[in-house]
Amino acid sequence: MVGAIWSMPPKDVMDYPIISLFNFFNNHKLLHSKNDRPKWLTVSNGSIQYVSKIIRFLDANPRVKTYKNINITEIKRKNNSITVKDSNNNENQFDHIIFATNPTKILEIVKDTDEKEKNILSSFSTNKNTAYLHNDKSLMPSLREVWSSWNVHIPKKKVDYISVTYWMNRLQNINNSKPLFLSLNPSKLPKEKSIFKIIDYEHPIFDLGSIDSKKQLPKIQGHRNTWYCGAWSGNGFHEDGINSSVELAKKFGIKILWE
């Protein structure tokens, strides 16, 4: 279950702190009786809905300039000025920078991390996972009656990955007349003609080192005009990404529209 929830390989599951695990299970009432469990809600048609809405909101603001699909290759900081260089060798200067990506990516592009930053950020690691969007029903349980939103497959032979198939019709309120599934690290590949898209992901790995470094993160927030947010700074979910960005916005004195 731990591997399925956090998309972690079996070899890393045993490094997940047991106290953090029990707290998570308790907060989500995963161990409660069926009648005491919360009714979970999802965003119809997926997270792209709120991502697109945020982009439209920013694009409509004349004070905001957005750059999309640009590969950042290097970031340097000097005298409270931050230089951002992209793959086309364009450089732009900024007063502050906010990283909304995982620490492994940050360490790749920031060339001047000091010892304090490096010690905290290097404690975080990620696991690569491949997802297949498809309509091959053979990757779902053979009994239609037991189809669930999340379907974990445990192969008979020992493997170093977790295989989960998500029933997208149920998760994102998609018409059942056209079956749609997302299989993460499938133990067998979907039929070639059934595949719509292949997506590579990197999910955070949570162990004692990263849990401790999350507590240390406030020590480098704002250090050298550099800030951090993202799901990795919480429990790895979309809500954690939003919560961390809201808390960061408050530090800049930004009014939260729904508060």
PLM feature spans:
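Mid-domain catalytic core of redox enzymes
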Residues: 73-202
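Short catalytic/ligand-binding loop motif for oxyanion handling, primarily in non-cytosolic enzymes
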Residues: 4-10, 106-108, 192, 236-238
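A structural signal for the hydrophobic beta-strands that form the central parallel beta-sheet
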Residues: 66-68, 99, 228
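Active-site catalytic microenvironments for nucleophilic, acid-base chemistry
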Residues: 57, 112, 251, 255
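Conserved beta-strand termini and adjacent loop/short-helix elements that scaffold enzyme active sites
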Residues: 69-71, 87, 229
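Conserved flavin/dinucleotide-binding core of flavoenzymes
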Residues: 159-259
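A structural signal for well-ordered alpha-helical segments within the folded catalytic domains
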Residues: 45-52, 104, 243-246
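Active-site/ligand-binding neighborhood in enzyme catalytic cores
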Residues: 1-73
